[in-house]
Amino acid sequence: LMHLMKVKYGLRLLAVHFDNTWNSTIATENIHAMTNALDIDLFTHVVDATEFDDLILSFLKSGVRDIETPTDIGLATTMNIAAEKYGVKYKIDGHSFRTEGSAPIGWIYMDAKYIQSVHRQFGKIPMKTFPNLWLYKQLKWMLLNRIESIRPLYYLKYDKETAKEMLTKDYGWKWYGG
């Protein structure tokens, strides 16, 4: 998506990375290879490893279906923090319902209260570095800052294998196993 937006459409981009400390070295190298080759600045928020491990463990202990919610919330919040900090009005979101699927409405919770309630019940370490998505902040970013999400993969033809081949050829991208 970075390649397409920068090379084909000529957009000025700011890459955003929520580092939950679970990245492989190869995945991190891929991020830097792409941003360096495309001359794109990178904004990274690194959460404390022990804190994030405790948060994920609390989701596992709770038995909820959506154990990836903390990572999703962390990324969404980090994107908004970066957009606000640098005055960016449009976030290009790489979510694709084709490759990531969708969930029934009753399974989807995307707010700080949910994260906090699961963590309060099952976690042990206070959350200090995790960028939680509080409703008032979400409303501020949407209504006052007027930050909008654009999801090109909802409209573009996307083939994961073709994308991997292009990334490997053009940027030295390596398969990281994820």
Describe every region a protein language model picked out.
Residues 1:
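Short, glycine-rich nucleotide/cofactor-binding loops
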Residues 4-178:
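Nucleotide-activated chemistry modules centered on ATP-dependent adenylation/adenylyltransferase
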